[in-house]
Amino acid sequence: MAKLDAYFGEYGGQYVPQILVPALEQLEQAFIDAQEDPDFRAEFMTLLQEYAGRPTALTLCRNLTKGTKTKLYLKREDLLHGGAHKTNQVLGQALLAKRMGKDEIIAETGAGQHGVATALACALLGLKCRVYMGAKDVERQSPNVFRMELMGAEVIPVHSGSATLKDACNEALRDWSATYETAHYLLGTAAGPHPFPTIVREFQRMIGEETKMQILAREGRLPDAVIACVGGGSNAIGMFADFIEEESVKLIGVEPAGKGIDTDQHGAPLKHGKTGIFFGMKAPLMQDEHGQIEESYSVSAGLDFPSVGPQHAHLNAIGRAEYGAVTDDEALEAFKILARNEGIIPALESSHALAYALQLAQAEPEKEQLLVVNLSGRGDKDIFTVHDILKEKGEI
């Protein structure tokens, strides 16, 4: 039986109850077989093109970098059906579930974007769907909850722990360990136990592949850097995957600094965490001196995750990718700037990557540089959050 690497350097692995090992082994083999099956790949590509709307555009932001010599492009995953990059890999995993003969899907969601993507894929492909969501997130993301329910998903609020994403993850895994014979756990990011980080990367890889072709067609060269926000890390690894071997291209991931890295209210485990075991993997983790998981924080629910995907941890460890952090205030400023100067309302998650790119442009205005930001999602889900913050600050 062919096997995928379970580790990226020292990170990754499969730290799960023994009962789940057969399900993960079955998933790994099904994925390997599917990747080698031209019919599966053709069905996946057809769904991406005809249902999801790929390829997505690469947009030059002419107004954002005025006064500098930076050319800034956005990879427009916000234009994908469902409103974010999540749709890509969800369609892939849902097809995989059908291939394995499973008719139920379990998922977890934070901001609700992965839940919405899972619900739409299940509606399309005729699968039953239940989504675990922290009770706090159910409150702050009510439009997405209703979207999921409209498409036939059962949304299950999780009240344990901090009632956020990490608790939803734990409940989803608990459910799967009791139902794995009929259900597939459709994990929402490039993290968790092997083989999920690899599967999610491969089902998001087209982001970087398209970007490479589009930028070569537009500019005749590769970008100096590709920049993406990092929570669990799926949109970033989707952008990075096809550029890892291109050593001239900097890979820049942006974690949420929340209210400041020097406070305890951030979500930056890569730079400020310690290695531990969480969610079935070995990875950097926000934990206290007793090894207990600390609460992560970000204005963006989708980045509010106390760990990070193992391949990002490895890319950071070997110096192939660099990871910065952007505060809530910096992300909000970038959100406003993009809306007012380009007529694009980005997700708060994506606004972190945009803020970092704008800082690079402004730091060296005379430097000619070609940057691509992965605009991983649209900001419809965030307008009420932003409205309340701006009102509190007296800006509206």
Swiss-Prot record:
GO molecular function: tryptophan synthase activity
N6-(pyridoxal phosphate)lysine carried by residues: K86
Stored CDD domains: Trp-synth_B
Enzyme class: lyase
InterPro entries to which the protein is assigned, alphabetical: Trp_synth_b_CS (IPR006653), Trp_synth_beta (IPR006654), Trp_synth_beta/beta-like (IPR023026), TrpB-like_PALP (IPR001926), TrpB-like_PALP_sf (IPR036052)
A GO cellular component entry from the record: cytoplasm
Residue stretches spanning the membrane: none
Enzyme Commission number: 4.2.1.20
Pathway the protein contributes to: Amino-acid biosynthesis; L-tryptophan biosynthesis; L-tryptophan from chorismate: step 5/5
Key words of the record: Amino-acid biosynthesis, Aromatic amino acid biosynthesis, Lyase, Pyridoxal phosphate, Tryptophan biosynthesis
Family affiliation: Belongs to the TrpB family.
Protein name per UniProt: Tryptophan synthase beta chain
Organism: Aliivibrio fischeri (strain MJ11) (Vibrio fischeri)
Gene coding for it: trpB
